[in-house]
């Protein structure tokens, strides 16, 4: 297998670094994006959620000012200081009282820390929260109600209060900086202070504003950290007085928050547009000028230096007593006129503000970059080397550190490998054969290293091994998390725990340490310790075990090396016994006699070293292969015992290596063959399609990492070989972490969990890979199990998600999959579990008892559905009004509203009882709309989709005149009677044709005082022709729509003429039946002629009732009325478009609900 390179692709480790550092310190923090106009929260850790009591889904996309934690005891000054910190680029600490979700109050120290990108621009803010004390301990009420808590609905988080940062003309203030009055600069001081003049003239009654006199000129010391005496001595006693009163519809922010009907106001920093209610910011040259201004000695500035006539006011300034302090702690010098306005934000909170409004870095911020970095490091308790930047960056490699996969390290490893092989061969040989010869020739003249070339080589090997130890202390490694570790300290610890001891023993130069002692045999034995390096050689060569030829070669080399070692031992045994034997029966004496070189009586002479080594190697090879010829035989007991051991070793090696070579190769290369086959396919794919190099490198790196992660195992292929019950158990084990720790799956039965586990699929994504693109169809729900991702809209990061977060769309609220409103991109190597919407809904249909719990406990951290891209999709107002449905069949949902309890024959009167709000199955509008008073079905009705069956394709409504109170003798329920006196409990398929006609009776005359009731819908076998589908602008032109409307208008004109005549005939027939009980409808006057009627109508008597039969007859007439020849054919598929809705009608939630003037209940 290739060398493990680890995660070397550029990763965005911003979130991982912050979490790793903060979680160990039990921090509570949030991360906000400084480039969106509301500084929305894009990440919050579990500690913050536990602190405030809100879930992550409720906190995400909230303003980072945390105004949803404000309450009665929250200081406005502290809140303003936090807002000011978001304007600058320096950190600030503020003490403020916050409220939890349960209403309990606590005092918190908030650290606002900016985060910069590689260009030095502030792109994010980290807000760290530290609890100082509980308010209950200092005498506050037990529970103060948090009136600003957000709604528990996850959809409400996107429309809650937002924090808009607007900066007015900064260039104009920059140009005016040089025009400050020269009289105010007579003192030699630092022109860094900021003086705030505030006019106490109240603002306009329609706005609620809080002038930021304190906010625009404060630093960390004056933000509740400096002594009160110094601040009072510098500023004066009047600095704590309020500077502006809050006026508007509500007397105070608290009163406004107490009103449940009031829309959530947004806290925004906006420029004051009134010259009478804004604060001017001007510069002070020194502390003397500040004292003069505090005492009123400094005259007001000229008009060109401010925006209006301002009254000097003693305000909170820098907590300093000298000019040097002003130089050191000067604040932003060009802050424009700012007020804190509570306004309603109707726009998209995620859209970035213009460049002029988004730039919040002061002109001198570039000069303070190094100071900011030091302070950020102090606040975060992080080292400067690990302070992250929010960008894709390669792993940090320390200086003088060698990558373990670099070319230099590869060459060096091969060099060390050759030296180790040399050591393994020559160390036993020199210890057995050469030491005896050296002793025998010790009387020879001393010629140094020239006579001993192997001694020089041994010295070089020792030096190389020592250098290798030093290199290993600076070589990176891959940890258990597949991360490349380059820190010298961690590398040293890892090396000490691993191969350091073996390398150290193998590198000891024993011949130099024992030089001159004369014990050459001891030196030779100690040198055998170098053979310990063979363990590392085996580990290095294991990567080549995937090649068949290499394995055969390695096996042969191993066999030869073992034979070499045994030959050295065989010679050492014969050489040791030779001087002590009286009878010359050893194998050496026999060898000398055979080759004609016998030993003399003094033990000298005999065969040469070459003859001895070759003979010993011949004996060991023949013994290991069990092919002994007997020409070299053991004679002494020691030689026979050694021969037995050699035979045992040889039998094992021969049987395990040579006897099973094919089996070994097949077993070792099964995975390797699959790897190379798949890799070959990838390369052929790259070559065939001519993929460019950057993309080719991504493909290869992803394949290699995925192969090392899964080892080339195809889970689907493996699972298909097992029965379904075993497949479910395996999938349950693989997804056990998700099913155990994810809240929506708690409480599910084991059978339900097994069914869900079968539907989950695991996705692995490298850094920089885009999982979902903007506009893609959302067909699955994603659960993050490892890594972190970011969600972008354009180039703006709107959310950062990590482990255990969920993103997608709420499947129970939409019948059809929506489209993504942003890009989802991986920051690190991520593992995600995804389940398709069809599979999830199918499982929940099988377990309806678990479905309620699942939908109620599912909290999607970020909703990717883009409602603006889908015409007629329900908005947040509809969803908050009860637009909650459950899946009853596949892709069919049942609306749970108050109307479900009514019987099919009951009549619900508009204006009596609770009106249905939102896109219900039988009502899509409300009376009093801008185009009529009749309820109508909008195009966003989920029941009108094609995949819900023909019975749900349309929702016809029946319109009947609103009746007066029913007489006591009338039948209950108010159903109209047929001619036979029976109740009509069935609906004509065309009886709802008038549901889409806006105020059709207005053609007869004045319809004032008449209301229409909504009858329960009945399934129609075929859709009405008047239910015109909403045509797509891309498929039908505007002229087709206009011609269709003209045809319908002509139909209505003919309908008026015939309806007047038919009504007279019908009413005369009804008046003859005196035995019938009068129905429950009030009398209707005879309608006059229509505005376009060609002939006058015959006068008739008063209309006593209007039955369903009459309306049914009229509906049938309309259904079978032919269209003119020039009118286009009406399509029958797609969502229906009611005639009461104009062509440019927007979403229903955007239209305010009005009650008609003739409504009796208004």
Swiss-Prot record:
Phosphorylated on serine and threonine residues. Phosphorylation by PKA inhibits ion conduction. Residues 233-316, 873-991, 1125-1162 are annotated as: Disordered. Residues 964-974 have a biased composition (Pro residues). Residues 885-894 have a biased composition (Basic residues). Residues 17-88 form the PAS domain. It comes from the Eukaryota. Glycans are attached at residue 600. Signal peptide: none annotated. Keywords: Cell membrane, Coiled coil, Glycoprotein, Ion channel, Ion transport, Membrane, Methylation, Phosphoprotein, Potassium, Potassium channel, Potassium transport, Transmembrane, Transmembrane helix, Transport, Voltage-gated channel. Residues 92-144 form the PAC domain. The modification Omega-N-methylarginine is found at residue 1017. Disulfide bonds: none annotated. Residues 1-405, 474-497, 544-549, 662-1162 are cytoplasmic. Residues 614-634 dip into the membrane without crossing it. Residues 932-943 have a biased composition (Low complexity). Residues 1038-1065 form a coiled coil. The chain crosses the membrane at residues 406-426, 453-473, 498-518, 523-543, 550-570, 641-661. It is found in: Cell membrane. Pore-forming (alpha) subunit of voltage-gated inwardly rectifying potassium channel. Characterized by unusual gating kinetics by producing relatively small outward currents during membrane depolarization and large inward currents during subsequent repolarization which reflect a rapid inactivation during depolarization and quick recovery from inactivation but slow deactivation (closing) during repolarization. Channel properties are modulated by cAMP and subunit assembly. The S4-S5 linker acts as a signal integrator where it both couples voltage-sensor domain (VSD) movement to pore opening and closure, as well as providing a binding site for other domains that regulate activation and/or deactivation of the channel. The potassium channel is probably composed of a homo- or heterotetrameric complex of pore-forming alpha subunits that can associate with modulating beta subunits. Interacts with DNAJB12 and DNAJB14; chaperones DNAJB12 and DNAJB14 promote tetramerization. Heteromultimer with KCNH6/ERG2 and KCNH7/ERG3. Interacts with ALG10B. Forms a stable complex with KCNE1 or KCNE2, and that this heteromultimerization regulates inward rectifier potassium channel activity. Interacts with CANX. The core-glycosylated, but not the fully glycosylated form interacts with RNF207. This is Voltage-gated inwardly rectifying potassium channel KCNH2.
């Amino acid at each position: 297998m290739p060398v493990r390179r680890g995660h070397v692709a550029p990763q965005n480790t911003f979130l991982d670094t912050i979490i790793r550092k903060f979680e160990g310190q039990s921090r509570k923090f949030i991360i906000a994006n400084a480039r969106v106009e509301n500084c929305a929260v894009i990440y919050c850790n579990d500690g913050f959620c536990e602190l405030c009591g809100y879930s992550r889904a409720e906190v995400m996309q909230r303003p980072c000012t945390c105004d949803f934690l404000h309450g009665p005891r929250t200081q406005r000054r502290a809140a303003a200081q936090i807002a000011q910190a978001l304007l600058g680029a320096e950190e600030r600490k503020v003490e403020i009282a916050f409220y939890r979700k349960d209403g309990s109050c606590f005092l918190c120290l908030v650290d606002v820390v900016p985060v910069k990108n590689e260009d030095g621009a502030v792109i994010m803010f980290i807000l760290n929260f530290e609890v100082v004390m509980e308010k209950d301990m200092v005498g506050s009420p037990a529970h103060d109600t948090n009136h600003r808590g957000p709604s528990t609905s996850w959809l409400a988080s996107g429309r809650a209060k937002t924090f808009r940062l607007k900066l007015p003309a900064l260039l104009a203030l920059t140009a005016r900086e040089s025009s400050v009055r020269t009289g105010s600069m007579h003192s030699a001081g630092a022109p860094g202070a900021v003086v705030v003049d505030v006019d106490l003239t109240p603002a306009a009654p329609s706005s609620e504003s809080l002038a930021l006199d304190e906010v625009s000129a404060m630093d960390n010391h004056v933000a509740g950290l400096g002594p009160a005496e110094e601040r009072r001595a510098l500023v004066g006693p009047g600095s704590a007085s309020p500077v502006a009163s809050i006026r508007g519809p509500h007397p105070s922010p608290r009163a406004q928050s107490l009103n449940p009907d009031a829309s959530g106001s947004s806290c925004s920093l906006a420029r004051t547009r009134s010259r009478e209610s804004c604060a001017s910011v001007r510069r002070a040259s020194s502390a003397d000028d500040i004292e003069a201004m505090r005492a009123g000695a400094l005259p007001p500035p000229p008009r060109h230096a401010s925006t209006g006539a301002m009254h000097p006011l003693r305000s909170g300034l820098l907590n300093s007593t000298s000019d040097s302090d002003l130089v050191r702690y000067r604040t932003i010098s060009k802050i424009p006129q700012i007020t804190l306005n509570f306004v309603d934000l109707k726009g998209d909170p995620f859209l970035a503000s213009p460049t002029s409004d988004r730039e919040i870095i002061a002109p001198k911020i570039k000069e303070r970059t190094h100071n900011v970095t030091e302070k950020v490091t102090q606040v975060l308790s992080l080292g400067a080397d690990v302070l992250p930047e929010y960008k894709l960056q390669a792993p940090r490699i320390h200086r003088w550190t060698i990558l373990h996969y670099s070319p230099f390290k590869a060459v060096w490893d091969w060099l060390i490998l050759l030296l180790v092989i040399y050591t393994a061969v020559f160390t036993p040989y020199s210890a057995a054969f050469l030491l005896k010869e050296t002793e025998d020739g010790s009387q020879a003249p001393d010629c140094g290293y020239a006579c001993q070339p192997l001694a020089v080589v041994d010295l070089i090997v020792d030096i190389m091994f020592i250098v290798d130890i030093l290199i290993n202390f600076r070589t990176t490694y891959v940890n258990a998390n597949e991360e490349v570790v380059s820190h010298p300290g961690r590398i040293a610890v890892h090396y000490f725990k691993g191969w350091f001891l073996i390398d150290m023993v193998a590198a000891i130069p024993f011949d130099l340490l024992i030089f001159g002692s004369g014990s050459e045999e001891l030196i030779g034995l100690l040198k055998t310790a170098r053979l310990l390096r063979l363990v590392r050689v085996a580990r290095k060569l294991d990567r080549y075990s995937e090649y068949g030829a290499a394995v055969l070669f390695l096996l042969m080399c191993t066999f030869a090396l073992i034979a070499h070692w045994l030959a050295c031992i065989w010679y050492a045994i014969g050489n040791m016994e030779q001087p002590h034997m009286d009878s010359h029966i050893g194998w050496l004496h026999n060898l000398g006699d055979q080759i004609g070189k016998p030993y003399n009586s003094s033990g000298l002479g005999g065969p040469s070293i070459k003859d001895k080594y070759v003979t010993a190697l011949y004996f060991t090879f023949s013994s290991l292969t069990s092919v002994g010829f007997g020409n070299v035989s053991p004679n002494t007991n020691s030689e026979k015992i050694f021969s037995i051991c050699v035979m045992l070793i040889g039998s094992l090696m021969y049987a395990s290596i040579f006897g099973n070579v094919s089996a070994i190769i097949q077993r070792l290369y099964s995975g390797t063959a699959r790897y190379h086959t798949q890799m070959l396919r990838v390369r052929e794919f790259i070559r065939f399609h001519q993929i460019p190099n950057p993309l080719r490198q991504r493909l290869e790196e992803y394949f290699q990492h995925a192969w090392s992660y899964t080892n080339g195992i195809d889970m689907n292929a493996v699972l298909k070989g097992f029965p379904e019950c075993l497949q479910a158990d395996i999938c349950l084990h693989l997804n056990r972490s998700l099913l155990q720790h994810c809240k929506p799956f708690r409480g599910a039965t084991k059978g339900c969990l097994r069914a869900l586990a079968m539907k989950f699929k695991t996705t692995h994504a490298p850094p920089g890979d885009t999982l979902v693109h903007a506009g893609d169809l959302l067909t699955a729900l994603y659960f993050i199990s490892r890594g972190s991702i970011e969600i972008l809209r354009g180039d703006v990061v709107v959310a950062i998600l990590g482990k255990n977060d969920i993103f997608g769309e709420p499947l129970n609220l939409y019948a059809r999959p929506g489209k993504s409103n942003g890009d989802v991109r991986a920051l690190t190597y991520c593992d995600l579990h995804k389940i398709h919407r069809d599979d999830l809904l199918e499982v929940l249909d099988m377990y309806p008892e678990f479905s309620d719990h699942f939908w109620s406990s599912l909290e999607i951290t970020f909703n990717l559905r883009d409602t603006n891209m889908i015409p007629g999709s329900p908005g947040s107002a509809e969803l908050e009004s009860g637009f909650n449905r459950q899946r009853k069949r596949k892709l069919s949902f049942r609306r749970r509203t108050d109307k479900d309890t009514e019987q099919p024959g009951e009549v619900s009167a508009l204006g009596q009882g609770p009106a249905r709000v939102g896109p219900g199955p039988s009502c899509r509008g409300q009376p009093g709309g801008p185009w009529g008073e009749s309820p109508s079905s909008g195009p966003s009705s989920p029941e009108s989709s094609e995949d819900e069956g023909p019975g749900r394709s349309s929702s016809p409504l029946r319109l009947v005149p609103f009746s007066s109170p029913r007489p006591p003798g009338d039948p209950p329920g108010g159903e109209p009677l047929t001619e036979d006196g029976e109740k009509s409990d069935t609906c004509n398929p065309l009886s709802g044709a008038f549901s889409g006609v806006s105020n059709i009776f207005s053609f007869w005359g004045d319809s004032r005082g008449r209301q229409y009731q909504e009858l329960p819908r009945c399934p129609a076998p075929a859709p009405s022709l008047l239910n015109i589908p909403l045509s797509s602008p891309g498929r039908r032109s505007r002229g087709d729509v206009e011609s269709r409307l003209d045809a319908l208008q002509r139909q209505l004109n003919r309908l008026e003429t015939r309806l007047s005549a038919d009504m007279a005939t019908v009413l005369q027939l009804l008046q003859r039946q005196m035995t019938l009980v009068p129905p429950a409808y009030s009398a209707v006057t005879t309608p006059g002629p229509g505005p376009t009627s060609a002939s006058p109508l015959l006068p008739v008597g008063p209309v006593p009732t209007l039955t369903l039969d009459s309306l049914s007859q009229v509906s049938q007439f309309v259904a079978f009325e032919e269209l003119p020849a020039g009118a286009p054919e009406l399509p029958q598929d797609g969502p229906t478009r009611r005639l009461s809705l104009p062509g440019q009608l927007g979403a229903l939630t955007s239209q305010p609900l009005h009650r008609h003037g003739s409504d009796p209940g208004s």
